[in-house]
């Protein structure tokens, strides 16, 4: 397996799909990386030579991905909580943050139902 940014990339997949295995790289960003490096989207990872892999590694290293991105996201949420903003309070209470209703939905965010004690 080829390693890019500390992640094992599947060998038998197309390069665009394989790059999506890295946290922080989606379809659009994977295509941009391929365009910048001049690699065909339909090329498979096992058919890339070492120079092409190095080009991709260099492009990926310029981005904020994996642990850095996760750390930044948690720090952003922690900052909102520390400031005492409405969004921070919603994060703290494990409720939807972006204005969704909570009377009937929001089970994913709230977690499983808690039984009412009689």
From Swiss-Prot:
Entry-linked Pfam families: Ribosomal_S13
GO BP, sorted A to Z: translation
InterPro entries per UniProt: Rbsml_uS13_C, Ribosomal_uS13, Ribosomal_uS13-like_H2TH, Ribosomal_uS13_bac-type, Ribosomal_uS13_CS
Span list, region Disordered: 92-118
Domain of life: Bacteria
Keyword vocabulary terms for this entry: Ribonucleoprotein, Ribosomal protein, RNA-binding, rRNA-binding, tRNA-binding
A cellular component term, taken from the record's GO annotations: cytosol
GO molecular function: rRNA binding; structural constituent of ribosome; tRNA binding
Subunit structure and binding partners: Part of the 30S ribosomal subunit. Forms a loose heterodimer with protein S19. Forms two bridges to the 50S subunit in the 70S ribosome.
Family under the similarity heading: Belongs to the universal ribosomal protein uS13 family.
Function: Located at the top of the head of the 30S subunit, it contacts several helices of the 16S rRNA. In the 70S ribosome it contacts the 23S rRNA (bridge B1a) and protein L5 of the 50S subunit (bridge B1b), connecting the 2 subunits; these bridges are implicated in subunit movement. Contacts the tRNAs in the A and P-sites.
Protein name: Small ribosomal subunit protein uS13
Organism per entry: Wigglesworthia glossinidia brevipalpis
